[in-house]
Amino acid sequence: MKLSLAAALLGALAVSAQTSTECNPLKQKCPADPALAGSADFGLTSESPRFHATGGTPTYGNDGASLTIGKRFDAPKLTSDFYIMFGYVEWEIKAAPGKGIVSSAVLLSDCLDEIDWEFLGGDPNQVQSNFFGKGDTTTYDRVKFHPAPNNNQEFHKYAVDWTADKTTFYIDGQNVRELTPDAAKGQYPQTPMRVLAGSWAGGDPSNNQGTIEWAGGETDFSKVPFTMFVKSIKVTDYSTGKEYVYKDMTGKWESIQAVDGQVNKSGKPGSGPKVESSTLPSSPSTSAHVPVHTVPGGGIGNPQAPNTGSSPSNTLTNGPSSTMTSLVGLPSSWIVTETGTGGVVTPTSAAESTSHHSDYTSRSSRSVSSSVSASSGNGGHGMTTSTGSGSAPTGTGSLPGSGSGSAPGYPVPTGTNGGGSNNPTDGGASPTSPAMQAPGSTGAIHSVSNALLLSFCAIAAWALV
């Protein structure tokens, strides 16, 4: 697969727009992460209370959870209500077909450590593996490609064995990639992770051309439905205790405390006490983490559904302190809000209520909000949404470039296909790269807001004359 530089850069941005965090413990004090603290086999032939659905309504049957894109802007996703601190996760998946359709299986932490499997519907014979540390997107040599024949016609098992010393990727039990902290060059994922799976349309015609090209081409929505099946998810948490707490803001695994337990550097899949898949966390502090919504960054996404086809305004407001604007170069209908540090988050569905808005999309220090979803509560975490559409945004900033809101100086992706060999060397290599953050967005927002206010006043004064 060969991509232009624009496709690589904007495609990377599109993928990063899918992962986010509600409260980043490297920047502020956050609630504890409820632990699985054992092993569980989640057969998804029926709904599991331990996985929360957003961006669409899954159905359940013999093939497991059906995550269906039935219309434009659907982006169904399952997110666990628990975390693991080193462990093993195996997703049994049949990826969604369709040009431009992206299926993902992801581990994601509150501080944006991330481990991904990603499938492109237009390329049913390979899968991509990827990783990120603390949301760092300064290099584009982390992804690898692996043979995965007929992945949208047949079920296969995609697993990650994540320890302090090594992360191993498996396809149907075969080791296809190993990642060590040294190979990760300081970006090794090492903080408590949630488990996710979902799909979205990277080929939506309102997205940037680079995003569409990365996803494999423009999606033809006359061919819906596009369905990803998740038959089961097996999870082992190698550590113990009722919850995980960040003792400081270093993001090192040694700084993670297991309350009433211990952090174990490694373990064995299936080990530890068996956790009933229907059992909800009982720790008093977990209520702040039960997903009241949420997505994609680097991995799974949630460019979730707008409910109108109208064009969004360039600058929107929702509440007294959440001015939002779009940035040139962002995928369509993603805008930036000043109530945070800036970055990329995907839209949330207008159909989702307040009780569905704090899990994956809103769990973000990349405080970006969508212009396409209805206003909803945000649990006090600075994430805002308002009604709009999926058309391509305009605004300040450029990609790449300089100035407020721009994403300057991104390197050209280099490297080769990781292939599917056993024990491949790591570091990743690919022209595609999830997760590109848009820095400096807060200043851009203030500039745009002030400029619009001055313009409005000037027009009003002129009219009076």
Curated annotation (Swiss-Prot):
<feature type="binding site">
    <location>
        <position position="118"/>
    </location>
    <ligand>
        <name>chitin</name>
    </ligand>
</feature>
<feature type="glycosylation site" description="N-linked (GlcNAc...) asparagine">
    <location>
        <position position="264"/>
    </location>
</feature>
<dbReference type="GO" id="GO:0005576">
    <property type="term" value="C:extracellular region"/>
</dbReference>
<keyword id="KW-0964">Secreted</keyword>
<dbReference type="GO" id="GO:0004553">
    <property type="term" value="F:hydrolase activity, hydrolyzing O-glycosyl compounds"/>
</dbReference>
<feature type="compositionally biased region" description="Low complexity">
    <location>
        <begin position="361"/>
        <end position="376"/>
    </location>
</feature>
<keyword id="KW-0326">Glycosidase</keyword>
<feature type="binding site">
    <location>
        <position position="211"/>
    </location>
    <ligand>
        <name>chitin</name>
    </ligand>
</feature>
<dbReference type="GO" id="GO:0031505">
    <property type="term" value="P:fungal-type cell wall organization"/>
</dbReference>
<keyword id="KW-0472">Membrane</keyword>
<feature type="compositionally biased region" description="Polar residues">
    <location>
        <begin position="304"/>
        <end position="325"/>
    </location>
</feature>
<keyword id="KW-0328">Glycosyltransferase</keyword>
<feature type="region of interest" description="Disordered">
    <location>
        <begin position="261"/>
        <end position="325"/>
    </location>
</feature>
<dbReference type="InterPro" id="IPR050546">
    <property type="entry name" value="Glycosyl_Hydrlase_16"/>
</dbReference>
<dbReference type="GO" id="GO:0016757">
    <property type="term" value="F:glycosyltransferase activity"/>
</dbReference>
<keyword id="KW-0732">Signal</keyword>
<feature type="compositionally biased region" description="Low complexity">
    <location>
        <begin position="339"/>
        <end position="348"/>
    </location>
</feature>
<dbReference type="InterPro" id="IPR000757">
    <property type="entry name" value="GH16"/>
</dbReference>
<feature type="binding site">
    <location>
        <position position="200"/>
    </location>
    <ligand>
        <name>chitin</name>
    </ligand>
</feature>
<feature type="region of interest" description="Disordered">
    <location>
        <begin position="339"/>
        <end position="442"/>
    </location>
</feature>
<keyword id="KW-0336">GPI-anchor</keyword>
<feature type="signal peptide">
    <location>
        <begin position="1"/>
        <end position="21"/>
    </location>
</feature>
<keyword id="KW-0134">Cell wall</keyword>
<keyword id="KW-0961">Cell wall biogenesis/degradation</keyword>
<feature type="lipid moiety-binding region" description="GPI-anchor amidated serine">
    <location>
        <position position="441"/>
    </location>
</feature>
<keyword id="KW-0449">Lipoprotein</keyword>
<keyword id="KW-0808">Transferase</keyword>
<feature type="disulfide bond">
    <location>
        <begin position="23"/>
        <end position="30"/>
    </location>
</feature>
<feature type="compositionally biased region" description="Low complexity">
    <location>
        <begin position="383"/>
        <end position="397"/>
    </location>
</feature>
<keyword id="KW-0843">Virulence</keyword>
<dbReference type="GO" id="GO:0005975">
    <property type="term" value="P:carbohydrate metabolic process"/>
</dbReference>
<comment type="similarity">
    <text>Belongs to the glycosyl hydrolase 16 family. CRH1 subfamily.</text>
</comment>
<feature type="active site" description="Proton donor">
    <location>
        <position position="118"/>
    </location>
</feature>
<dbReference type="InterPro" id="IPR013320">
    <property type="entry name" value="ConA-like_dom_sf"/>
</dbReference>
<keyword id="KW-0325">Glycoprotein</keyword>
<feature type="propeptide" description="Removed in mature form">
    <location>
        <begin position="442"/>
        <end position="465"/>
    </location>
</feature>
<dbReference type="GO" id="GO:0098552">
    <property type="term" value="C:side of membrane"/>
</dbReference>
<feature type="compositionally biased region" description="Low complexity">
    <location>
        <begin position="277"/>
        <end position="287"/>
    </location>
</feature>
<protein>
    <recommendedName>
        <fullName>Crh-like protein ARB_05253</fullName>
        <ecNumber>3.2.1.14</ecNumber>
        <ecNumber>2.4.-.-</ecNumber>
    </recommendedName>
</protein>
<feature type="domain" description="GH16">
    <location>
        <begin position="22"/>
        <end position="223"/>
    </location>
</feature>
<feature type="active site" description="Nucleophile">
    <location>
        <position position="114"/>
    </location>
</feature>
<dbReference type="Pfam" id="PF00722">
    <property type="entry name" value="Glyco_hydro_16"/>
</dbReference>
